[in-house]
């Protein structure tokens, strides 16, 4: 029993691919952010701790209210619907789906999405680690998800909400700028975007992953990222800093600076890995754009958007395997071999792995608590950054060459 709740048989794992997992953690200190205030007071600056204490007012009593709402609408169909639609905010979804607009002639739109998504992920991860606020507790909630990994992050802000907000605003902005479309078509497309948005955002509450503060703060981050991207894109159209020789150095340096100076959480939280991935993608697409404009590599800019279903299918059948082969087959062994064997960087992965092993095999009361912050190996940060920077190179530089050779450009 925990706070009057029966905790027997409280963790239910899916037995088939189609069924989501139902997680409850009776030892709530195993989830980050749930320790008493003294745990954070000694590990935070006074300013940071005071902000956290003020925000706790919005999270302390949310779990039972959210649990009643979840119980009211819980069904097998909703479990499947909201867990699988949540994949539209997942890491793998972006790896496979973000390249597609590039192959159909929408490179600039993809750049907009990469900037908005990349900085939404970074800022939401930064504030998660800065505030160290807990997710709603389960029990009384059920965390309905396809992966236990995501349940071990802090709560606010919601990165799913930040992404959905920024991208939905971008879609709506582009829809209402389509002068060749009728108002009826624009309204229909807007309804589709809003349906996507409501599904992704309210799904976070239904799945027991986030509370109201998480959604509001995530939404604000998405709005800010959209406004900043649009402001710089249209306010300084003639600046063209991406055409200067130093721009790739600045892009890579800026991305790595943001990552190596990222705020340190108090407890272990895996969301930093997504920040590394997206900062790599941002830098990668900037460097590809620079190569295209400085050296005249224009194949990606010449791809025709209205190409018919045969060419559309052909580009997908050629482009997607290229991305999968780079990301999931050759990139990791190649990049780590170069970093360790050629550039002689120290491989510090074993040190972090040993610390994690020790943290998860504690004796006594401490084995019922999440470990304190251990951090990512420096070689993993650099390696992951380069691997994900390689995804835009595969999409923007390699795939259009293959399209041209196969006469599907």
UniProtKB/Swiss-Prot annotation:
Changing residue 210 to A: Impairs dihydrosphingosine 1-phosphate phosphatase activity. GO terms for cellular component: endoplasmic reticulum; endoplasmic reticulum membrane. This is Dihydrosphingosine 1-phosphate phosphatase LCB3. It catalyses: (4R)-hydroxysphinganine 1-phosphate + H2O = (4R)-hydroxysphinganine + phosphate; sphinganine 1-phosphate + H2O = sphinganine + phosphate. Changing residue 160 to A: Impairs dihydrosphingosine 1-phosphate phosphatase activity. The lineage of its organism: Eukaryota, Fungi, Dikarya, Ascomycota, Saccharomycotina. Changing residue 128 to A: Impairs dihydrosphingosine 1-phosphate phosphatase activity. Residues 15-35 are annotated as: Disordered. The active site is at residues 160, 210. The keyword Membrane applies.
